[in-house]
Amino acid sequence: KIGIFFSTSTGNTTEVADFIGKTLGAKADAPIDVDDVTDPQALKDYDLLFLGAPTWNTGADTERSGTSWDEFLYDKLPEVDMKDLPVAIFGLGDAEGYPDNFCDAIEEIHDCFAKQGAKPVGFSNPDDYDYEESKSVRDGKFLGLPLDMVNDQIPMEKRVAGWVEAVVSETGV
C-alpha cells in the first residue's frame, strides 16, 4: 500500500499529489493533506510514502516552513519510528523568483523523516534544473523531485511520471 501526503499553499502541490495518485492507480490511497493526519502512527501502515511540500524558506524563517508540515514534522513525527520505511519527497519551488533556496522544503522533510529511521529514495539529478542554490542538494543529487510549475520547460506530468516509475522500481513496491 502506498500513501501520498502533502501540504499546499496555492493548490499546486495538491495537483501533483493527485497526479501521483492517478499514476499509481489502485496501488495508492487517495492523497491526504498532512493537516488532516490525526494519527501519525498510521503512516507506518504503508509500504512506501510520497511526501510533498510547496515552496518555503523564502527568507522569513529559515527553519520552519509556515505550512502544515511544521506541526507534523516537529510535534507529531518525533513520536513515530519509521524504521526503513521508504519515503520519496517532492517539492515545489520557483527557480526564478527564489533561485537561492529552490525547493528547500525537500531537505527539511528528508532530514526529519530520516531522523526517525525512514529510508529516503527517489533522488534526482540537479543538472536538469536552472537554479542558483538549494539546501535540498547533497552529494550531487536532489534529495527528491523538485518541481517548478511556472518556469520549467519540461511538463510536470512528464517529470512526475518518470520519477514515480523510478521510485516504484527502486523500492520494489
Swiss-Prot record:
Its cofactor is FMN. The keyword Iron does not apply. Gene3D superfamilies: 3.40.50.360. Signal peptide: none annotated. Keywords: Electron transport, Flavoprotein, FMN, Transport. Residues 2-168 form the Flavodoxin-like domain. GO terms for molecular function: electron transfer activity; FMN binding. Disulfide bonds: none annotated. It comes from the Eukaryota. InterPro entries: Flavodoxin, Flavodoxin/NO_synth, Flavodoxin_CS, Flavodoxin_lc, Flavoprotein-like_sf. Belongs to the flavodoxin family. Low-potential electron donor to a number of redox enzymes. This is Flavodoxin. It comes from Chondrus crispus. The lineage of its organism: Eukaryota, Rhodophyta, Florideophyceae, Rhodymeniophycidae, Gigartinales.
